[in-house]
């Protein structure tokens, strides 16, 4: 699967800019899954099956799986998504950042072991730390730019010369120099719509992964208005907890579907 091709097809055929984040917390699972050895896979796969036709992509967060020694369940989950819902891109949210030789191994892990279609990457160490991911030209490389957390301003607003802030330099570098294979994207948080608009101005129609709506409080209308591309797509607007934990009983997947449908439709009202 070519990530960018699949993403654009999903925007069009599913009429959706919604990305569902898969951040499984076993303490919040329905009681009937407690103590089950494959609880993480069962929980996530039911969410996936209930919402796949409503999303443009899924985004499992690797830390939630690794903390529970459940990397094998992550591998099975991504395989399940590809088998049951062909054409649905999967972003491995790992935010990797290391020197080239280590980055190469992380790229193998993401794309060959787990079978992800894209990965989130920290660009702080520069181009050589990102190059091993870029070499997988059919895979998406989604680089942190203006993150949704409050502490993001500690570094991302630093002036790097000529009045240019660090997040702006990252956006410009990625769009103008690193995206030679057309497989780059950026992370820009929904909690900062002014910065979303600035990044969109700098990068043209480059896709943006936008976390921060739902539990983090980002405004959907402001996010869409600031971040949509000229063709009214260009966004992967992520919601995790507000969808995953919309219900807490046997009908949790149906509750997740209702929450995902409401979120997708709210996004579309502002396109």
From Swiss-Prot:
Please indicate which superkingdom the organism of origin belongs to.
Answer: Bacteria
Q: Name one GO biological process term.
A: 'de novo' UMP biosynthetic process
Reaction catalysed by this enzyme? orotidine 5'-phosphate + H(+) = UMP + CO2
**Pathway(s) served:** Pyrimidine metabolism; UMP biosynthesis via de novo pathway; UMP from orotate: step 2/2
Q: Which InterPro entries match?
A: Aldolase_TIM, OMPdecase_type-2, OMPdeCOase_dom, RibuloseP-bd_barrel
Which is a Pfam family this sequence falls into?
A: OMPdecase
| Active-site positions on this chain | 95 (proton donor)
The record, for CDD domains, names: OMP_decarboxylase_like
What does the sequence similarity comment in the record state about its family? Belongs to the OMP decarboxylase family. Type 2 subfamily.
Could you list this entry's UniProt keywords, alphabetically sorted: Decarboxylase, Lyase, Pyrimidine biosynthesis
Cysteines joined through disulfide linkages: none
Q: What is its EC number?
A: 4.1.1.23
The enzyme's first-digit EC class, named in words, is: lyase
This one is known as Orotidine 5'-phosphate decarboxylase
- Its source organism is Aromatoleum aromaticum (strain DSM 19018 / LMG 30748 / EbN1)
SMART domains (UniProt xref): OMPdecase
Q: Which gene encodes it?
A: pyrF
Gene Ontology molecular function: orotidine-5'-phosphate decarboxylase activity
